[in-house]
Curated annotation (Swiss-Prot):
UniProt xrefs under HAMAP family: TruB_bact (MF_01080)
Active site residues according to the UniProt entry: D38 (nucleophile)
Annotated organism of origin: Syntrophotalea carbinolica (strain DSM 2380 / NBRC 103641 / GraBd1) (Pelobacter carbinolicus)
The protein's Enzyme Commission number: 5.4.99.25
Descriptive protein name: tRNA pseudouridine synthase B
Annotated Pfam families: TruB_C_2 (PF16198), TruB_N (PF01509)
Gene, per the UniProt record: truB
GO biological process, one term: mRNA pseudouridine synthesis
Length: 306
């Protein structure tokens, strides 16, 4: 059983716990997920089953959309409501225009400092474990992009907004930084992932709904590898190219049934009659001894025949 399942993660569960539940519900050991959600958060969690775990690296590259709520005037050690309050300030002087100006200033690319309470590791140890021991270590800021930030409600001290951001962005740090810029502190109180790559929360299914389904019906929820990678350009491979792929050899451009009209370096999905064959990078200029006009990134056993 191979495929992608879009789960609406409930509040209070870790992403790892969701994966464990899916393992039991589908009777599979090989299950993984793309893009961790904190226990506080809900919404889109992309779960891969079987051979589909091989495409997680491509799904993790995509941008995300979140709906977040914050409260002004209180700073916590975790930057969210699950932490301890470490500072307070009266936000009574904050008006809607000040909030709008600060939120507008957040749009763009900048270096974001990851919080100590995160799954990032220092010398193999997760930062959150060090933080719980009262240890703070230096972290390297990471380049992130906020493509859009739309205010939905401004009722100080409570603010709700939607944010479209690049992978690896910490939304609770956005909330913390908004509080810093407003001069009163802030922390995240609610977070829902509305979209991850092409996957919208409207197509997500709850764990409760999966449990209520008959076991034999659950595979109907799965997206194929080709469907999950639908945002990548796809190329149909001729039988000769499919045979080469079976030996791990990339096809040449003349083994592609479609017109290749994109730039060198583009990541593409190679497909056959039955679905996905491989993810590859188009590199027509590579040395001839490398064989083929593509560099294979991942090969699947999905699409060689109908």
């Amino acid at each position: 059983m191979n495929g992608i399942l879009i789960v609406d993660k409930p509040q209070g569960m870790t992403s790892h716990a969701v994966v464990g539940r899916i393992r039991r519900l589908f009777g599979l050991r090989k299950v993984g997920h793309a893009g961790t959600l904190d226990p506080l958060a809900t919404g889109v969690l992309v779960v891969a089953l079987g051979q589909a775990t091989r495409i997680l690296q491509f799904l993790m590259q995509e941008n995300k959309v979140y709906r977040a709520s914050l409260v002004l005037g209180k700073t916590t050690d975790t930057q969210d409501s699950e932490g301890q309050i470490v500072a307070t300030s009266d936000p009574g002087h904050i008006d809607a225009q000040s909030v709008a100006d600060v939120c507008h200033s957040m749009v763009g690319s900048y270096d974001q400092m990851p919080p100590m309470y995160s799954a990032l590791k220092k010398d193999g140890v997760p930062l959150y474990k060090l933080a719980r021991q009262g240890v703070e270590v230096s972290r390297k800021p990471r380049r992130i992009t906020i493509f859009d930030l739309q205010l939905l409600a401004v009722e100080p001290p409570n603010i709700t907004f939607d944010v479209h951001c690049s992978k690896g962005t910490y939304v609770r740090t956005i909330c913390h930084d908004i509080g810093v810029k407003l001069g009163c502190g802030a922390h995240l109180t609610a977070l829902r992932r509305l979209r991850s790559a092409p996957f919208d929360v409207k197509e997500a299914v709850t764990l409760e709904a999966i449990e209520l389904m008959a076991p034999e019906d659950r595979p109907e929820l799965l997206l194929s590898i080709a469907e999950a990678l639908r945002e990548y350009p796809s190329l149909n491979v001729c039988p000769e190219g499919i045979k080469r792929l079976g030996y791990g050899i990339p096809p040449t451009a003349d083994m592609i049934a479609d017109t290749i009209d994109f730039e060198e370096g583009t990541q593409v999905l190679l497909v056959g009659p039955g679905g996905a064959l491989a993810m590859a990078t188009y590199v027509p200029s590579r040395a001839r001894e490398s064989r083929g006009d593509f560099e294979l990134l991942r090969v699947f056993n999905d699409g060689g025949s109908s």
